[in-house]
Regions:
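Serine-esterase "nucleophile elbow" of acetyl-processing enzymes
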Residues: 1-78
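Alpha-helical cap/lid subdomain in secreted, periplasmic
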Residues: 46-51, 68-211
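Polar low-complexity intrinsically disordered regions
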Residues: 1, 211-212
Length: 212
């Protein structure tokens, strides 16, 4: 495989590393890993208390980039639970569901190789109104994520779309910002209701391995 090469996010990653040096985050924390919907979750530390949270979402990122920077902003933290949300940007840029599933599978492999007790809370893609033409491919990716979770007890798949949709499957008008892409405050509140139970279960599952 060719070495990962991207300079697009160098400043973001360098900023994370500077923050880590100035204020080293705890080992065995809850880690947010993925794209901007995680990065922009302003109330996350409060919403997921009392778990220590490290948010390493970076805007516009694809699974290639999250994988590429794993050695710098995922693995060094030895996280206890990772909430992973990425893949929608890949598909929006023309990538296939199969390619996204393969990269998420590789992310899981590398995470567990470095940190055998880590748990993964794998969020679905977001079928946002502005990306309607890509929904079918996103749903294929989600089915792959669901299958990955079914094959690995340490992965919990969470489909966030039902929480963001009306009963007929159309997006709720109140859960997205004006860009029809990123979650609003109401959107994050809806997501929290389905993500928090999975995080609680994952944290509990690692109690013995992460006892001080």
């Amino acid at each position: 495989k060719p070495a990962f090469s991207s300079t697009k996010y160098d400043k973001d990653i360098a900023a994370f590393e500077s923050a880590d040096k100035a204020n080293p985050p705890p080992q065995g924390a809850l880690l947010f890993s993925g794209a901007s919907s995680l990065r922009l979750w302003k109330t996350a530390a409060r919403d997921f208390a009392p778990y220590p949270l490290i948010n390493r979402g970076f805007g516009g990122s694809k699974t290639t980039e999250v994988l590429g920077y794993m050695d710098r902003i995922v693995l060094p933290y030895h996280p206890r639970v990772v909430v992973f949300h990425c893949g929608s940007n890949d598909i929006n840029a023309g990538d296939t569901a199969e390619a996204v599933i393969a990269r998420v599978t590789e992310y899981h492999r590398r995470l567990r190789a470095e940190n055998p007790h880590a748990q993964l809370v794998l969020l679905s893609t977001t079928q946002a109104p502005s990306r309607r033409t890509k929904w079918a491919e996103m749903k294929k990716a989600d089915e792959g994520f669901r299958a990955l979770a079914a094959a690995h007890p340490e992965i919990r798949f969470v489909d966030i779309n039902p929480a963001l949709n009306l009963p007929d499957g159309e997006p709720r008008p109140d859960v997205y910002l004006k860009d029809n892409l990123h979650p609003s405050e109401a959107g994050y509140a809806a997501m929290l209701k389905v993500i928090r139970p999975a995080v609680d279960a994952a944290w509990q599952a690692t109690e013995a391995a992460f006892k001080k």
